[in-house]
Amino acid sequence: MAREKFERKKQHVNIGTIGHVDHGKTTLTAAITMCLQSFSKNKGKRYDEIDSAPEEKARGITINTAHVEYETENRHYAHVDCPGHADYVKNMITGAAQMDGAILVVSGADGPMPQTKEHLLLAKQVGVPTLVVFLNKEDQVDDPELLELVELEVRETLDKYEYPGDDIPIIAGSALLALEALIENPNVKPGENEWVDKILKLMQNVDTYIPTPVRETDKTFLMAVEDVFSITGRGTVATGLVERGTLKTGATVEIIGLRDTTTTTVTGLEMFQKTLDETVAGDNVGVLLRGVQKDNIQRGMVLAAPGTIKPHTKFEAQVYILTKEEGGRHTPFFPGYRPQFYVRTTDVTGKIESFTADDGSEALMATSGDRLKMVVELIQPIAVENGMRFAIREGGRTVGAGVVSTILK
């Protein structure tokens, strides 16, 4: 059966849900898709269709980032339901790096919890520019004053992580009660159910408060590979977020990083089960590649316009070392330290060879709160360019965040 074409009629925005485990992120995602199905041809998704990994169902927690799509009157959204559990922050780094804005879900019954704060810190580090807050489980809070206190605490927490706490819209509601109402009657109209109306109000705020991102469509094409599938009879598909530029079917691309660079032709493009002639920056797309075996391409590689980006192993970077209050290390580290470097969709072990202080003198160690330059050598080559951002992590915690300043090798 031929796939229908994806029609680009509305502005496309990538958003996601972040927040503490069990505060209701996936339930909210399901409620939003069902609530908005009248604006698009897409069917709403039930909770169990979003919560997809078997391990999640067993533990009732979300691990892999699940992509769903929905539309409001003005926009087309791709929505990432982000992991809510400490061990899965790794996926948040690769999943959240793709958000133009996020909905922070906080339980009105609990208020901000440790992971709420960890996700806010990560959102700041990976550059999620704007947030809207959904204060969930409002039905479980009997006293309106308690809810006001929680809202106040949320605003203070946002301020602490350098988000404008006074300005960010906070909408209270119950994702579960809205979802139950929508399952009972999928055609609920605005004004018929107070809980469904609160979801609509949330999405109106997302529409107006999260700005439409300026896409870098005039630059050369680059997409980090997030996943690889093989389709019988058609070949290998690499999926990911187009970071910049545009790509048409029939174009030549290079596959770069982790092993030798290869060149191939794009034989097809797909987004949300529909075909495209051209993909642009900001799309979550599947790229069908001619003559590439599934084993020859993996997560962490990039597809790029030929000759535009090269694999490197050694660079100098400007780095900020997190304080322990921000979730960083409690002790300093020295040259020779070998943490993980998270870049786009991959993590690679690297050795930190030397530090330089701001004044140009050699620093003997890096302690929390430092801003310094460091020379890093990775154990595998990946696509690196000046201005590229990365996170440094070790044993489940983020140690630092940096930007490549000079490529050395």
UniProtKB/Swiss-Prot annotation:
Annotated region (G2), positions in chain: 60-64
Protein name: Elongation factor Tu, chloroplastic
Annotated ranges, domain tr-type G: 10-214
Family: Belongs to the TRAFAC class translation factor GTPase superfamily. Classic translation factor GTPase family. EF-Tu/EF-1A subfamily.
Catalytic activity: GTP + H2O = GDP + phosphate + H(+)
Positions bound to GTP: 19-26, 81-85, 136-139
EC number(s) given by UniProt: 3.6.5.3
This protein's GO CC annotations: chloroplast; mitochondrion
